[in-house]
């Protein structure tokens, strides 16, 4: 959409207009949203809004630019096997979310089949006043902003808001999934569906994630990398959305220590259910998280964008302000309870990428396992 021109301008003309005014216009896409960021000086604010309006309301999706974007994305996918960590996380995500939209990443086949008409139809169905939110920060007043937005976007008509997609349910534990690659290192990912931002468990899960794998003092780093010396990269990821989240513990290790690292990771995940975290560790995690949160909102743009995304996700208006309070209220008992609830071994997804002929122990020691053919 950004590089494909508009009904009023060819792609090159649109690029020239942006360059002449030193306008930075960026479009990115997540699983839930299309994000447009416009940065411009005060002198060219009106001109930039015209360009933004044309791109948002009447994109051209120029065939040549569309084909270029398609080829770039396909080449990225073809190179994915050269990135073992990226490939493992792609397959883990598909297994964790299964048939939900979050479990259907782009494939070479889907990109090959994409047409300009598909893009235009997607735009007609999903981009309209009923689905778009705009946040503005800078040297303009609220009144001036409302007037300018009304002037440039007031005539926009379109479809009604999109019906939200149902959150995925946690998959029951199945076999350990194995991706064969003749590489000297293995990638291990063990994860679960977790609580969303609107869950009472969100703050405790955030703290638990940080303690288990969020820094140099985390349990996984201290045990697997520092004490055992078996991983060049290890940690956890907790990615909360509004109604659900995803938690994953990961490690990259030599082929000859793959099973040992799987055992250690599983042991750490079980330990936070069995024993309370000590007060010093809990205090360290809470302080680190609250300080990081504060430094994430130093500019007016960061605050405006954060508030808009909260509104987009249907979160309370004071969600950002209450975050430190929620983190600091987490107790050791909360961590044990959340670990028992969300790290249930009966709902666990495990993916291992590597060369099983070089593993220290067979994967069968962890139960049934199945080789996975990666479908790019």
Residue ranges and their predicted role:
Residues 1-39, 82, 105, 215-230, ...:
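M16/MPP (pitrilysin/insulinase) zinc-metallopeptidase core fold and M16-derived inactive scaffolds
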Residues 4-9, 38-71, 215, 235, ...:
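M16/insulysin-pitrilysin zinc metalloprotease superfamily fold
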Residues 99-106, 128-129, 133-196, 297, ...:
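An aromatic/glycine/proline-enriched structural segment found at the starts
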Residues 72-88, 172-186, 225-231, 242, ...:
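Short acidic/His-enriched helical or mixed secondary-structure segments at domain edges of catalytic enzymes
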Residues 133-137, 251, 283-376:
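C-terminal regions of mature proteins
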Residues 5, 80-129, 149, 240, ...:
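Scaffold signal of the M16-like zinc-metallopeptidase fold and its non-catalytic homologs
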Residues 10, 14, 45-48, 65, ...:
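Stable alpha-helical elements in mature extracytoplasmic
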Residues 1, 18, 36, 52, ...:
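Buried hydrophobic packing residues in well-ordered domains
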């Amino acid at each position: 959409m950004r590089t494909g021109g508009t009904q009023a301008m060819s792609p090159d003309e649109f690029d020239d207009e942006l360059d002449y005014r030193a306008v930075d216009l960026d479009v990115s896409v997540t699983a839930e949203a299309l994000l447009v960021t416009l940065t411009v000086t005060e002198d060219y604010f009106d001109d930039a809004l015209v360009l933004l309006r044309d791109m948002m309301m009447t994109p051209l999706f120029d065939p040549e630019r569309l084909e270029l974007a398609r080829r770039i994305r396909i080449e990225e996918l073809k190179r994915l096997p050269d990135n073992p960590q990226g490939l493992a996380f792609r397959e883990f995500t598909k297994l964790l979310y299964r048939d939900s939209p979050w479990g259907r990443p782009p494939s070479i086949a889907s990109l090959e089949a994409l047409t300009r008409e598909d893009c235009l139809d997607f735009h007609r169905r999903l981009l309209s006043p009923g689905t778009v939110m705009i946040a503005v920060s800078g040297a303009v007043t609220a009144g001036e902003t409302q007037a300018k937005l009304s002037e440039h976007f007031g005539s926009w008509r379109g479809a009604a808001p999109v019906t939200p997609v149902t959150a995925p349910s946690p998959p029951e534990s199945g076999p350990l999934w194995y991706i064969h690659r003749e590489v000297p290192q293995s990638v291990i990912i063990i994860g679960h569906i977790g609580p969303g931002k609107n869950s009472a468990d969100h703050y405790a899960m955030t703290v638990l994630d940080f303690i288990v794998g969020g820094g140099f003092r985390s349990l996984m780093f201290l045990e697997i990398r520092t004490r055992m010396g078996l991983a060049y990269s290890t940690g956890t990821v907790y990615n909360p959305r509004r109604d659900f989240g995803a938690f994953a513990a990961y490690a990259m290790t030599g082929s000859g220590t793959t099973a040992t690292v799987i055992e250690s990771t599983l042991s750490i995940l079980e330990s936070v259910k069995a024993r309370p975290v000590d007060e010093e560790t809990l205090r360290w995690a809470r302080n680190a998280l609250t300080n990081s949160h504060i430094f994430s909102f130093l500019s007016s743009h960061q605050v405006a964008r954060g508030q808009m995304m909260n509104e987009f996700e249907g979160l309370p208006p004071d969600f950002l302000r209450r975050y430190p309070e929620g983190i600091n209220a987490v107790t050791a008992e909360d961590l044990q309870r959340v670990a028992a609830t969300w790290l249930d071994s009966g709902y666990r997804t495990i993916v291992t990428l590597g060369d099983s002929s070089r593993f220290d122990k067979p994967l069968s020691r962890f139960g049934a396992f199945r080789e996975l053919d990666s479908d790019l």
